[in-house]
Amino acid sequence: MSQIAQPITIRNTTFKNRIIKGAMSEALANYEGQPNDLHLGLYSAWAKGGLGCAITGNVMVNFEAKNEPGVVVIETERDLERLKEWAAVGKQYGMVQLIQLSHPGRQCPKGLNKETVAPSAVPFSPALATMFGTPRALTHEEILDIIKRFANAARICEKAGFEGVQLHGAHGYLISQFLSPLTNKRTDQWGGSIENRTRFLLEVYKAVREATSESFIISVKLNSADFQRGGISEEDVISVFKAVDEAGIDLIEISGGTYEAPAMAGAKADKRKASTIAREAYFLDFAEKIRQHVKCKLMVTGGFRTVEGMNAALASGACDFIGIARPLAVETDLTDRLIAGQDVRYAVKPIKTGLPFVDKMAIMEIIWYAAQFKAIGQGKKPNPKLSPLIVFLNYAKGNIKAVVQGRVNSRKSA
């Protein structure tokens, strides 16, 4: 049996194979952050395609802190019945589902929320300052409230029938902002030393663990590096991985980058050593290193394109799961094909509109794939040749209309 086809168990949940869909922003929810039939259609397509596990796109824990329009928000049990339908889609086809819980912190476009908050009031680089405003530093009480929100959202996810959650601690979102010395300038218990900067993540994990059952899976997505000068050091990264592993985390997904240095979207020049390129995965070298320090399951996402490369990564022991994201946006049956020995069919090329100020941002990658997700959710086939420029213009038109009408910030409990 191929390595990728072998089942594996975490707590009481068996994953039928080693392929996990990495989180990608769906942007399919309505203005009130509610999931709908498009989510059911999209995840049903992946489940029917043999996927072992799907990690959802960002699900926000606070309606007033959304990273983009169309994001799902879980604050209350308002949408419990719809969430149950979503969870049932996976169970019908034996696909595990982990809801990715997140808070964007400062990483929110201007005009989307009334204000942005972060560990510290650190502005974005000049290149992105026109799109993202300077945040307000969180108070101690607000930090505790956000921790409770993560726990409450996880509780609701379990009640709905999902097998677990993933805490988004990468890509420059709030947990990542606490971890990085570039965005965390605090001098209290939440900042300073790496132990203090890790405190928020650990407190979120502990709160989620206490709010859910022993069989509920808790994963976290962490950066191997943020690829910014003065950012978190490798020594500190290893410390974070060890701390969350010792706390009892079940699965760590290894990623990297932020909106200011978007390695997660494949936007950086490829400076990996030749041996890593030959083995495909962006973060496999780091996985091999961190494997010596942690006992939990590891997942590497980014760059896998051949069955041989995936099987080799699993056989090496560097990781337990293969994360695949963008190829699944244009090949919903990819998992079945991989297990049958066929490689990724479509080469995933950088998404370029021809507009320099747009193309330098990771957001273009996100919205192009979101357009594919909408088509899949409607029962249509994805289109690998879809024009990025047309997608961007439609996205910009829709967002400007939403902000002008004031519907994005309409306050209804989620």
Where do the language-model regions lie?
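Flavin-dependent oxidoreductase catalytic cores
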Residues: 1-414
